[in-house]
């Protein structure tokens, strides 16, 4: 019996069918890692929180359900809350931070890890600054109160939707007294 063309191709690469299946399975599992396994480096998170809230701010970790929230204060006065999340870009996760002030308005957003080959403009300050001061009552929609980025439509839409959802969660948890 002659080997199939696929088996001959694998043999030419020095792979058996079992090796090829193992390789494909491993790559599939790697791509499906949960968002929690794709967190930013601690130094990057610390730099982002310092940039947003200033040096010397105290950061306490709070757990609400399965979510991690950072409560930020200085000299006992609440500065706001921050949360790190992942959202799917075109193909890969985008790790971002949403930071609020004590009145639940967006203080800033930060792109902590951008993994896509294109669309990285969502990390640039001119695009991020349009979120500042927005509340959960704002539409936060690309094309309305948030500008689109030519060539980064998927990323700008994904980040905008994710920021809107995260801001709504933080605002609700704060109103419910769950962020103490």
Where do the protein language model's features map onto the residues?
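Flexible, solvent-exposed loop/hinge segments and secondary-structure transition points
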Residues: 33-157, 161-180
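A cross-taxon signal for low-complexity, glycine/charged-rich
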Residues: 1-24, 31-34, 38
């Amino acid at each position: 019996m002659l080997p199939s063309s696929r088996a001959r191709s694998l043999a030419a690469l020095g792979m058996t069918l079992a090796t090829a299946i193992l390789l494909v399975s491993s790559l599939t599992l790697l791509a499906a890692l949960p968002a929690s396994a794709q967190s930013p480096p601690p130094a990057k998170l610390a730099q982002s929180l310092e940039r947003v809230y200033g040096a010397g701010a105290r950061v306490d970790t709070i757990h609400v359900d399965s979510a991690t929230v950072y409560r930020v204060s200085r000299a006992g006065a609440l500065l706001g809350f921050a949360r790190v999340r992942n959202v799917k870009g075109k193909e890969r996760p985008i790790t971002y931070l949403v930071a609020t002030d004590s009145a639940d308005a967006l203080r800033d957003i930060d792109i902590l890890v951008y993994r896509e080959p294109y669309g990285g403009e969502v990390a640039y300050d001119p695009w991020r600054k349009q979120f500042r001061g927005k509340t959960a009552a704002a539409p936060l929609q690309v094309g309305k109160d948030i500008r689109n980025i030519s060539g980064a439509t998927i990323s700008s839409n994904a980040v905008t939707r994710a920021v809107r959802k995260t801001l709504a969660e933080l605002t609700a948890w704060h109103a419910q007294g769950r962020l103490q």
